[in-house]
A protein has these predicted regions:
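Pyridoxal 5′-phosphate
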Residues: 1-393
């Protein structure tokens, strides 16, 4: 197969043509600053308002609860740092999970250096947060619970409704990093008692450099970026109107096609999983088998070093990942795989393949065929595999 096979949609996605078409006029025709008072800026102002409603409709929020940011990482930083500052008089204890994206984990570590205490709740072997451990960790000085909606590496969908109920029971604010789940799986902020939510444009076939923060009305949160009075004086900086239009259109399209795309992606994903587990020995599927993002498959192959596997896949024209795109340059094993109990030597042999509605069954079968040959080749060069085969017949 001569064309590129892109199976790293959890890292970033191709911008939909309809999204690009919606954005283009705001670069060259309707380029006015939406904060300006003259009529020329009105088209930009209306475009921002429309996108705000498009985002709000996806999660069952009010338009005035939607704030635009520079991306998912900014939204996560804002959620933790600004909340910590705003609620520090009540307490300085924050709860999160051991498998969060580094935008959360590194921010939590920064807060620890600035006088806050963070509890990292464990997960089970499938990456589901331990709800009893979460509730037991809540203290009188707990000000925030932050748990992701779905894991970016292993695809496990977390029980947001149950987490939200626990947070509500104890009067604690609940934030979720929904970068991987937003517009891919149904989320309703009221039903799930979500106080804050982070999302990103480039994970839903929208542009890079634009994110979203949902902040429920009544939540105290300080400004994170200071300057002008944009975003109801909570997030300064001239609006990125083309990006805002893009994320709004992408969200609208994603939700309109969610049911159809989910059905299609699950069919391909399950075919991929079944072939890999059946045809490649000493392989493990990581993440929950059913409560899983529709496009995610994550495996560990024993006696394999992940970087070599990715290089050989790349030579075959296949784009995959060993985990998060934000850490794929690291040789350290995934903190997510270690948290679900995998030993270092197995975690090193991980592969994440994430599909899209444009992925074909032919591409999946080609990928599995190439992967089988690559695994066989790499294992043939492994003294550990040779020793294992000799001892186990």
């Amino acid at each position: 197969m001569s064309k590129l096979i892109y199976l790293d949609n959890a890292a970033t996605t191709q911008v939909y043509p309809e999204v690009l078409d919606a954005m283009l006029p705001y670069f060259t025709e309707h380029y006015g600053n939406p904060a300006a008072i003259y009529s020329f800026a009105g088209e930009s102002e209306r475009a921002v308002a429309k996108a705000r409603k498009q985002i709000a409709d996806v999660i069952g929020a009010k338009t005035e609860e939607i704030y635009f940011t520079g991306g998912g990482s900014e939204s996560d930083n804002w959620a933790l740092k600004a909340t910590a500052e705003a609620y520090s008089s009540k307490g300085k204890h924050i709860i999160t999970s051991a498998i969060e994206h580094h935008a959360i984990l590194h921010t939590a570590q920064w807060l620890e250096l600035h006088g806050f205490e963070v509890t990292y709740v464990g997960v089970d072997e499938n990456g589901k947060i331990k709800l009893d451990e979460l509730e037991a960790a809540i203290r009188p000085d707990t000000i925030l619970i932050s748990v992701m909606a779905a894991n970016n590496e292993i695809g496990t969908i977390e029980p947001l409704k149950e987490i939200g109920a626990i947070a509500k029971k104890h009067g604690v604010l609940f934030h979720t990093d929904a970068v991987q789940a937003f517009a891919h799986v149904p989320i309703n902020v009221d039903e799930m008692n979500i106080g804050m939510l982070s999302a990103s444009g480039h994970k839903i076939n929208g542009p890079k450099g634009i994110g979203v923060m949902y902040i429920r009305k009544g939540v105290k949160i300080r400004s994170f970026i200071h300057g002008g009075a944009q975003e109801r004086q909570r997030r300064a900086g001239t609006h990125n109107v083309p990006g805002i239009v893009g994320i709004g259109k992408a969200a609208e399209l994603a939700v309109a096609n969610m049911e159809k795309n989910t059905e299609y992606e699950v069919k391909l994903r399950d075919h991929l999983i079944e072939r890999v587990l059946h045809e490649i020995p000493y392989t493990r599927l990581n993440g929950d088998r059913t409560d899983r993002l529709p496009n995610n498959a994550n495996f560990c192959f024993r006696f394999i070093e992940g970087e070599s596997m990715l290089i050989l896949l790349d030579q075959a024209g296949i784009c995959g990942s060993s985990g998060s795109a934000c850490t794929s340059g690291s040789l350290d094993p995934s903190h997510v795989l270690l948290a679900i109990g995998l030993p270092h030597e197995i975690a090193h042999g991980s592969l994440r393949l994430t599909l899209s509605e444009k992925t074909t069954m032919e591409e999946i079968d080609y990928t599995v065929d190439k992967l089988k040959a690559i695994i066989e080749r790499l294992r043939s060069m492994s003294p550990l595999y040779e020793d294992f085969v000799r001892k186990n017949g």
